[in-house]
Amino acid sequence: VAATGAQSLAAGLGVADEGGNAIDAALAAAFVALATEPGLVSFGGGAFINIWPAESEPVVIDGNVEMPGRGLPHDRFGAGVREIWTDYGGGVLMHAGHGTAATPGCVPALARAHADYAKLSWPRLLEPAIFAARDGYPMGAAGARYLNFVADSLFGDDPEAHRLVTRGDGSLIEPGEVTANPLLADTLIALANE
């Protein structure tokens, strides 16, 4: 199992030890990464999933985001977009705000991979992510580094979002510091029960 952090790895290994297949392990690890790496990956984003079944050709599940209103004249979109410059990665210009929101494709792609290739139940694969979001997880070094650049500029306009990526006093979460997202846990419980 390849994973981005200890909790993701444990989730993947745990379902593999229970008899899950490679897709089960990858999905469990991905769910935990999505729940514990704020800013780096998101359930609200896109995903491309590459699967090569043993007895057939490789498959790519396209879970890219869709832009609502694509094809409409530019003047139909209105305002709500702000430009944010960050020094992260050598310098990146981002666009943020409600005018930049896309329809997420990540969860539908994960659901398709589960329906077509997984062995264990959907709720079982979400359990480790629910636990991590509800009970806490150590902030990874990569996530803390990214949030150091964007916690205020990207998340600062929305007090609720800002609280999710900083401490209660607004200061930055350090690598290894335990944080949680109970509202995400509630959402994942609902997703598990769908």
Task: Report each predicted region and the residues it spans.
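Noncatalytic scaffold domains of N-terminal-nucleophile
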Residues: 1-10, 14, 22-194
